[in-house]
Amino acid sequence: MTDFSVWEAAPFGATVDHILQRYHNVHRAQFEELVPLAQKVAQVHADTFPAEIAGLLADMRDELLMHMMKEERMLFPMINQGVGRGAAMPISVMMHEHEEHDRAIARLKELTGNFHAPEGACGSWTRLYALAKEMADDLNDHIHLENDILFARVLDS
């Protein structure tokens, strides 16, 4: 896991900016590649590829894009304005959605055998699982930074 100690005392605005650049922008790029790649692998290897993966990744993308938009348009501006505990309700909603993201990651791990492509898998299949693991690791770090550091600090302010 990433070292987040720098964010434990950083100004809220700096933490929000980091989340936007390091996670929101990165997730958008990850899913731009992941979803079409999963659809390609599902089509080419329909007889052996777990059919649910492509749909799950598309659903994860759609849910995460909506989630990030809510943070960017509502929650993060509130945090940057210093509303403190006034952000408790939107933070609660975001944390609930984070639990849904955690469940989706768990299902993806299950479907992919913890991101291990089968022996002899083609390059696209292998790349898909490597990218999916990277996205899941990033999303876990992203959720930790928000829930356990940023949101906790905002609610304590």
From Swiss-Prot:
Its name, as the record gives it, is Iron-sulfur cluster repair protein DnrN
Keyword Glycoprotein present in the record's keywords: the answer is no
Q: Where is the signal peptide?
A: none
Q: Which UniProt keywords apply?
A: Cytoplasm, Iron, Metal-binding, Stress response
The entry summarizes the disruption phenotype as follows:
Mutant is more sensitive to damage induced by a sudden exposure to nitric oxide and is more sensitive to hydrogen peroxide.
Report if keyword Manganese is assigned: no
Classification via Gene3D superfamilies: nmb1532 protein domain like
Q: Which residues form a coiled coil?
A: none
Q: What does this protein do?
A: Di-iron-containing protein involved in the repair of iron-sulfur clusters damaged by oxidative and nitrosative stress conditions. Required to repair damage caused by nitric oxide to FNR and NsrR transcription factors.
Superkingdom of origin: Bacteria
Q: Where in the cell is it found?
A: Cytoplasm
Instruction: Give the similarity note.
Output: Belongs to the RIC family.
Originating organism: Neisseria gonorrhoeae
